Regions:
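Amphipathic/hydrophobic helical signal segments and adjacent flexible N-terminal regions
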Residues: 1-102, 114
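Short, hydrophobic/aromatic-rich segments at coil-to-beta transitions
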Residues: 17-18, 69-71, 103-106, 126-133, ...
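Beta-turn initiation residues at beta-strand->coil junctions
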Residues: 23-25, 135-137, 158-161
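Short, surface-exposed coil-to-beta transition loops
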Residues: 35, 88-91, 116-119, 140-143, ...
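Short, exposed beta-strand/loop patches in secreted or surface proteins that constitute
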Residues: 94-99, 121-126, 146-147
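Acidic, glycine-rich flexible loop segments
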Residues: 108-142
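Mixed-charge, glycine-accented linear interaction segment located at domain edges/termini
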Residues: 139-152, 159-163
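Conserved small/polar residues in nucleotide/adenosyl-binding loops
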Residues: 172-177
Length: 183
């Protein structure tokens, strides 16, 4: 049963904390699947945080429109990694709602996944309180859906069209909501 989530900012707040992720990535061109795992830390960025002003400036948006956001750090590995290959990085998100309910709008990032330039995606929440994110890059586009199957279980599906043409399914688990606190 989906969790009741009022808006995208509430969805982000539920995502804050420490998570372990299991991933299955399907490389359509190679007709092969690759497994991976990550440790992820998500921290809330409150309205007025200087990092949100930085995201707004990089995306040519007004900081006054941003209602909040997150700072995300991760460390992981994939089955096909070469020696010394690292999957450690971080990014920041800022939310700009386009409706009064805060369930659709722009998701600003300081940089994209594949491209290191700032990027803005369109988000909306569906009837099951899943967060749908569509991001268009110069050479590709991605469609992602994030949702909570319970307070300690978050899921994500992702389809990338363009250079890599892959599909992913991710499972995020956390011990309990109170254990997700990041200090």
């Amino acid at each position: 049963m989906p969790l009741e989530i009022a808006d995208a900012l509430s969805f982000f707040r539920l995502s804050c904390g420490r998570w372990t992720s299991q991933r299955s990535q399907h490389h359509l061109l190679h007709r092969r699947a690759e497994a991976g795992a990550s440790f992820i830390v998500v921290e809330e960025l409150h309205k007025g945080d200087a990092r949100l002003a930085e995201i707004a400036q990089r995306n040519n948006e007004s900081v006054e429109r941003i209602v909040g956001g997150c700072w995300v750090r991760w460390s992981g590995s994939m089955a096909w990694d070469r020696a010394g290959e690292s999957h450690e990085d971080q990014t920041m998100f800022g939310l700009i709602p386009s409706d009064d309910a805060g369930r659709s709008g722009l998701l600003l990032r300081d940089r994209g996944y594949a491209e290191k330039a700032p990027v803005a995606g369109q988000f909306h929440m569906d009837a099951e309180n899943g967060l749908i994110l569509t991001t268009d890059y110069e050479m590709m586009s991605s469609l992602e859906r994030f949702w909570f199957a319970g307070p300690n279980l978050r899921l994500r599906t992702s389809t990338v069209q363009g250079l890599s043409n892959n599909a992913s399914c991710l499972l995020y688990t956390s011990p309990s909501p109170r254990d997700r606190n990041v200090s």
